[in-house]
Structure formats: C-alpha cells, structure tokens
Amino acid sequence: KSLFLVLFLGMVSLSICEEEKRENEDEEKQEDDEQSEMKRGLWSTIKNVGKEAAIAAGKAVLGSLGEQ
C-alpha cells in the first residue's frame, strides 16, 4: 500500500511540475509576442514618418523649381 501511495504522490508531483512548466512557456511566448508587436508598431511608425518626410521634401523641391 505504501508503494502505491509513493507512486501516486510522485505522479501528482510530476503532473504539477509539468503544468507549471507549460504555464511558464505560455507566459514567455506571450511576452515574445507582445515584444514583436511593439517592434512591428515601431517600424510602422518609422516608415510612416519617413514617407511623410519624403513627401514634404518632394513638395519643397517642386515648389522651389516652380518659383524659378
């Protein structure tokens, strides 16, 4: 009987450890996803700012050519 009790408690302990490991992996994956999303948003913002700057520079050049 005591051997079954030891085996049962060992299985329960192992199950709990595996569950905690899965939860930690899920949390790490979620953090990685959030960081990737933030990086994507940052690159999108940088791209939009660059695009607007290029448009403004192009308009300035065309405006100066039109004045000549």
Swiss-Prot record:
Predominant subcellular localization, coarse grouping: secreted
Skewed-composition ranges (Acidic residues): 25-35
Keywords: Amidation, Amphibian defense peptide, Antibiotic, Antimicrobial, Cleavage on pair of basic residues, Secreted, Signal
Propeptide residue interval(s): 18-38, 67-68
Protein location: Secreted
Residue positions, PTM Leucine amide: 65
Gene Ontology biological process terms, A to Z: defense response to bacterium
Function: Has antibacterial activity against the Gram-negative bacteria E.coli ATCC 11775 (MIC=0.5 uM), and the Gram-positive bacteria S.aureus ATCC 12600 (MIC=0.5 uM) and M.luteus ATCC 49732 (MIC=2.0 uM). Does not inhibit the growth of the fungus C.albicans. Probably acts by disturbing membrane functions with its amphipathic structure.
Tissue: Expressed by the skin glands.
UniProt record similarity statement: Belongs to the frog skin active peptide (FSAP) family. Dermaseptin subfamily.
A cellular component annotation (GO) from this entry: extracellular region
Name used for this protein in its record: Dermaseptin-H5
Region (Disordered): 19-40
Residues annotated as signal peptide: 1-17
